[in-house]
């Protein structure tokens, strides 16, 4: 009997160990599966907003409002399932929070009847957000590593949240300016050819596109000033050198300089056409490298 009991206890211990090991391997897969399912739902939620580009005549109606709300809801559900905090230093988190900020600002402008016919950009904004969502899902498949997050005294500092908020708003405004610049190029090409296309008819007029791209950049410059000041203050809270220039700070300062130069030239002269578009796209590229670009390098290339 003692031998039988000994063997039974050994089998029970072995079974418990096997269950623990299989559970350890099964849990990450379940967690990964729920995150990917949320990513697919997020992509589907962006399709109605992207489909606005196919409407014969864009309108600010209930279908536009519903597509904006669905895109925002899908992004928030994704952030809730993945647990990506706004202070996370991950690449996917940067893309998803940037998407949500663009949706909220664009939705607010549409509801409040913002700048000249900004709602005509809905389909192109949806396509941009869809590209970001697919990119984030691809990198989620490549590696589901847990990114670093801000901790220590900086986490409880108001400067951190001012810096994060201003960074997201600045990048969203510059993104909207870049999309307005794209609309400007399409309208300018149609006017030169004296043959409007179905794509140019769906976009804001040339003058409205120029007004929006410059206006969005002006707003972004003011918000970026807050971001730069809060960034230096955050360094002080973290005990880092104020004069240490890293890649993110350098690219941000270059982007700010590019925006200020464009605004200065536009106010002092009659800067029009392709030159203004180049400045806008240059500022967008620099801020893209400074925000999600740095996260990509540190998370998947260097890290």
Please report, for each region that a protein language model flagged, where it lies by residue.
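Juxtamembrane inter-helical linkers in multi-pass membrane proteins
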Residues: 191-207
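Membrane-interface helix-loop-helix junctions at boundaries between adjacent transmembrane segments
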Residues: 83-170
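Juxtamembrane boundary at the C-terminal end of a transmembrane helix
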Residues: 291-303
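Interfacial loop-to-transmembrane junctions
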Residues: 266-285
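Short alpha-helical packing/oligomerization segments
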Residues: 235-258
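Short aromatic-rich membrane-water interface segments that cap or initiate transmembrane helices
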Residues: 154-171, 207-215, 242-245
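Hydrophobic transmembrane alpha-helical segments in integral membrane proteins
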Residues: 31-47, 166-174
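Central hydrophobic cores of alpha-helical transmembrane segments in multi-pass inner-membrane proteins
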Residues: 42-53, 69-80, 98-111, 259-261
């Amino acid at each position: 009997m003692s031998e039988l009991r000994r063997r039974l206890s050994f089998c029970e211990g072995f079974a418990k160990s096997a269950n623990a090991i299989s559970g350890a391997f099964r849990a990450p897969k379940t967690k990964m599966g729920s995150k990917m399912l949320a990513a697919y739902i997020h992509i589907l939620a962006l399709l109605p907003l992207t489909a606005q580009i196919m409407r014969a005549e864009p309108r600010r109606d209930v279908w536009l409002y519903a597509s904006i709300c669905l895109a925002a809801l899908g992004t928030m559900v994704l952030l809730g399932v993945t647990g990506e905090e706004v202070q996370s230093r991950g690449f996917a988190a940067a893309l998803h929070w940037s998407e949500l900020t663009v949706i909220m600002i664009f939705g607010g402008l549409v509801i409040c009847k913002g700048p000249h016919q900004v709602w005509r950009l809905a389909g192109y904004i949806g396509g941009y957000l869809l590209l970001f969502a697919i990119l984030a899902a691809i990198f989620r498949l490549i590696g589901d590593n847990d990114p670093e997050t801000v901790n220590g005294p900086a986490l409880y500092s108001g400067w951190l949240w001012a810096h994060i908020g201003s960074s997201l708003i600045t990048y969203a405004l510059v993104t909207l300016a870049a999309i307005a610049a794209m609309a400007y190029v399409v309208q300018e090409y149609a006017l030169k050819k004296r043959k409007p296309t179905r794509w140019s008819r769906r976009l804001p007029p040339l003058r409205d596109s120029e007004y929006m791209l410059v206006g969005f950049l002006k707003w972004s410059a003011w918000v970026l000033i807050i971001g730069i000041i809060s960034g230096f203050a955050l360094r002080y809270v973290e005990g880092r050198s104020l004069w240490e220039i890293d890649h993110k700070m350098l690219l941000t300062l270059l982007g700010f300089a590019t925006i200020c130069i464009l605004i200065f030239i536009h106010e002092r002269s009659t800067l029009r056409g392709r030159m203004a578009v180049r400045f806008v796209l240059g500022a967008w590229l620099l801020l893209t490298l400074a925000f999600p670009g740095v996260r990509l390098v540190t998370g998947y290339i260097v890290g």
